[in-house]
A protein has these predicted regions:
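Short, conserved secondary-structure transition motifs
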Residues: 166-180
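Core mixed alpha/beta domains of very large multi-subunit molecular machines
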Residues: 1-158
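Flexible helix-coil linker/hinge segments at domain or subdomain boundaries
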Residues: 157-168
Protein backbone atom coordinates (compact mmCIF):
# COMPACT_ATOMS: atom_id res chain seq x y z
CA UNK A 1 0.00 0.00 0.00
CA UNK A 2 1.11 3.56 -0.63
CA UNK A 3 -1.14 6.35 0.68
CA UNK A 4 1.01 8.96 -1.06
CA UNK A 5 0.07 8.06 -4.63
CA UNK A 6 -3.15 8.97 -6.39
CA UNK A 7 -6.04 6.52 -6.57
CA UNK A 8 -5.54 6.48 -10.33
CA UNK A 9 -1.85 5.52 -10.12
CA UNK A 10 -0.09 2.21 -9.64
CA UNK A 11 3.48 2.19 -8.37
CA UNK A 12 5.53 -0.03 -10.69
CA UNK A 13 9.03 -1.20 -9.75
CA UNK A 14 11.69 -0.08 -12.22
CA UNK A 15 12.72 -3.71 -12.71
CA UNK A 16 9.22 -4.57 -13.95
CA UNK A 17 9.00 -1.37 -16.04
CA UNK A 18 12.08 -2.50 -17.98
CA UNK A 19 10.35 -5.77 -18.95
CA UNK A 20 6.91 -4.43 -19.87
CA UNK A 21 6.92 -2.55 -23.16
CA UNK A 22 4.70 -0.03 -24.90
CA UNK A 23 4.82 0.12 -28.71
CA UNK A 24 5.59 3.63 -29.98
CA UNK A 25 5.14 4.33 -33.69
CA UNK A 26 8.00 6.42 -35.06
CA UNK A 27 6.96 9.66 -36.74
CA UNK A 28 8.70 12.94 -37.56
CA UNK A 29 7.62 14.48 -34.21
CA UNK A 30 8.98 11.76 -31.90
CA UNK A 31 11.93 10.29 -33.81
CA UNK A 32 14.51 12.29 -31.81
CA UNK A 33 13.08 11.18 -28.46
CA UNK A 34 12.84 7.55 -29.55
CA UNK A 35 16.45 7.57 -30.77
CA UNK A 36 17.54 8.75 -27.29
CA UNK A 37 15.49 5.96 -25.72
CA UNK A 38 17.09 3.39 -28.05
CA UNK A 39 20.57 4.70 -27.20
CA UNK A 40 19.79 4.08 -23.50
CA UNK A 41 19.52 0.39 -24.39
CA UNK A 42 17.43 -2.24 -22.69
CA UNK A 43 19.20 -2.27 -19.32
CA UNK A 44 18.71 1.42 -18.41
CA UNK A 45 15.30 2.93 -17.72
CA UNK A 46 13.82 4.58 -19.75
CA UNK A 47 15.02 2.49 -22.65
CA UNK A 48 13.72 0.11 -25.27
CA UNK A 49 13.87 -3.65 -25.75
CA UNK A 50 12.94 -4.13 -29.42
CA UNK A 51 12.19 -2.37 -32.67
CA UNK A 52 9.85 -3.64 -35.36
CA UNK A 53 10.72 -2.73 -38.93
CA UNK A 54 7.97 -1.81 -41.43
CA UNK A 55 8.36 -5.25 -43.02
CA UNK A 56 7.51 -6.90 -39.67
CA UNK A 57 11.03 -8.03 -38.71
CA UNK A 58 11.61 -7.64 -34.95
CA UNK A 59 15.10 -6.79 -33.66
CA UNK A 60 16.31 -7.00 -30.07
CA UNK A 61 18.22 -3.95 -28.83
CA UNK A 62 21.55 -4.82 -27.20
CA UNK A 63 24.55 -2.80 -26.08
CA UNK A 64 26.36 -3.96 -29.22
CA UNK A 65 23.74 -2.87 -31.76
CA UNK A 66 21.90 0.08 -30.15
CA UNK A 67 23.87 2.75 -32.09
CA UNK A 68 23.23 1.02 -35.41
CA UNK A 69 19.53 0.64 -34.62
CA UNK A 70 19.23 4.31 -33.56
CA UNK A 71 20.65 5.32 -36.94
CA UNK A 72 18.43 2.83 -38.79
CA UNK A 73 15.00 3.83 -37.46
CA UNK A 74 12.78 6.04 -39.55
CA UNK A 75 9.07 6.78 -39.84
CA UNK A 76 7.07 3.58 -40.05
CA UNK A 77 9.17 1.71 -37.48
CA UNK A 78 7.77 0.73 -34.07
CA UNK A 79 9.91 1.03 -30.94
CA UNK A 80 8.93 -1.21 -28.02
CA UNK A 81 9.96 1.13 -25.23
CA UNK A 82 9.95 0.55 -21.48
CA UNK A 83 6.87 1.36 -19.44
CA UNK A 84 7.13 4.99 -18.33
CA UNK A 85 5.34 7.36 -15.95
CA UNK A 86 1.82 8.08 -17.16
CA UNK A 87 1.39 5.00 -19.36
CA UNK A 88 -2.00 3.28 -19.06
CA UNK A 89 -1.93 -0.14 -17.39
CA UNK A 90 -4.61 -2.58 -16.28
CA UNK A 91 -4.29 -3.96 -12.76
CA UNK A 92 -6.01 -7.21 -11.83
CA UNK A 93 -6.32 -9.45 -8.79
CA UNK A 94 -7.47 -13.02 -9.26
CA UNK A 95 -10.12 -14.30 -9.12
CA UNK A 96 -11.82 -11.75 -11.38
CA UNK A 97 -15.37 -12.16 -10.13
CA UNK A 98 -16.67 -8.79 -11.32
CA UNK A 99 -15.56 -6.00 -13.64
CA UNK A 100 -14.19 -3.93 -10.76
CA UNK A 101 -11.40 -6.46 -10.16
CA UNK A 102 -9.72 -5.18 -13.36
CA UNK A 103 -9.21 -1.42 -13.50
CA UNK A 104 -6.97 0.97 -15.42
CA UNK A 105 -4.25 2.90 -13.60
CA UNK A 106 -1.50 5.21 -14.79
CA UNK A 107 1.99 3.81 -14.22
CA UNK A 108 4.28 5.56 -11.80
CA UNK A 109 7.79 4.11 -11.86
CA UNK A 110 9.19 3.73 -8.35
CA UNK A 111 12.08 2.05 -6.54
CA UNK A 112 11.87 -1.25 -4.63
CA UNK A 113 10.23 -4.48 -5.74
CA UNK A 114 6.48 -4.37 -5.15
CA UNK A 115 3.46 -3.00 -6.97
CA UNK A 116 1.81 -0.21 -4.99
CA UNK A 117 -1.71 1.16 -4.94
CA UNK A 118 -3.48 3.72 -2.78
CA UNK A 119 -5.25 2.21 0.23
CA UNK A 120 -8.60 3.60 -0.91
CA UNK A 121 -8.50 1.39 -4.03
CA UNK A 122 -8.25 -1.92 -2.17
CA UNK A 123 -12.01 -2.60 -1.89
CA UNK A 124 -12.74 -3.47 -5.56
CA UNK A 125 -9.68 -5.73 -5.67
CA UNK A 126 -10.51 -7.26 -2.27
CA UNK A 127 -6.82 -6.69 -1.48
CA UNK A 128 -5.65 -6.99 2.11
CA UNK A 129 -1.86 -6.96 1.65
CA UNK A 130 -1.20 -10.38 3.14
CA UNK A 131 0.69 -11.57 0.08
CA UNK A 132 -1.93 -10.88 -2.57
CA UNK A 133 -0.80 -11.52 -6.13
CA UNK A 134 -1.67 -8.70 -8.53
CA UNK A 135 -1.24 -8.82 -12.30
CA UNK A 136 -0.24 -5.79 -14.37
CA UNK A 137 -1.18 -5.68 -18.06
CA UNK A 138 -0.12 -3.10 -20.66
CA UNK A 139 -2.53 -2.43 -23.54
CA UNK A 140 -0.57 -2.74 -26.80
CA UNK A 141 -2.57 -0.58 -29.21
CA UNK A 142 -3.64 3.06 -29.05
CA UNK A 143 -7.27 1.94 -29.27
CA UNK A 144 -6.88 -0.43 -26.31
CA UNK A 145 -5.10 2.25 -24.27
CA UNK A 146 -7.89 4.76 -24.95
CA UNK A 147 -10.60 2.20 -24.22
CA UNK A 148 -8.96 1.25 -20.91
CA UNK A 149 -8.56 4.90 -19.93
CA UNK A 150 -12.16 5.82 -20.78
CA UNK A 151 -13.98 2.72 -19.52
CA UNK A 152 -11.75 1.18 -16.87
CA UNK A 153 -10.02 4.13 -15.14
CA UNK A 154 -10.43 4.13 -11.37
CA UNK A 155 -11.66 7.74 -11.42
CA UNK A 156 -14.52 6.68 -13.73
CA UNK A 157 -15.54 3.72 -11.56
CA UNK A 158 -15.90 5.11 -8.06
CA UNK A 159 -19.47 3.84 -7.63
CA UNK A 160 -20.35 0.17 -7.62
CA UNK A 161 -22.32 -0.93 -10.68
CA UNK A 162 -24.13 -3.40 -8.42
CA UNK A 163 -25.61 -1.14 -5.73
CA UNK A 164 -24.45 2.42 -6.51
CA UNK A 165 -22.43 3.03 -3.35
CA UNK A 166 -18.82 4.24 -3.48
CA UNK A 167 -16.26 1.45 -3.63
CA UNK A 168 -13.22 3.74 -3.58
CA UNK A 169 -13.16 4.59 0.11
CA UNK A 170 -11.40 4.15 3.44
CA UNK A 171 -11.75 0.78 5.14
CA UNK A 172 -10.29 -1.15 8.11
CA UNK A 173 -6.75 0.04 8.99
CA UNK A 174 -7.18 3.18 6.91
CA UNK A 175 -9.92 4.42 9.28
CA UNK A 176 -8.03 3.34 12.40
CA UNK A 177 -4.89 5.13 11.22
CA UNK A 178 -6.86 8.32 10.58
CA UNK A 179 -8.33 8.17 14.09
CA UNK A 180 -4.92 7.80 15.70
Amino acid sequence: PDPNISIGDVGVPEEIAKELTVPAKVNKNNIGDLKKIILSGSKVHPGANYIVRPDGIRKKITDDNKKDIAEEIDTGYVVERHLMDGDITILNRQPSLHRMSMMAHRARIMPYRTLRINLAVTIPYNADFDGDEMNLHVPQTEEAQTEAEMLMAVENNIRSPRYGLPIIACKHDHITGSYM
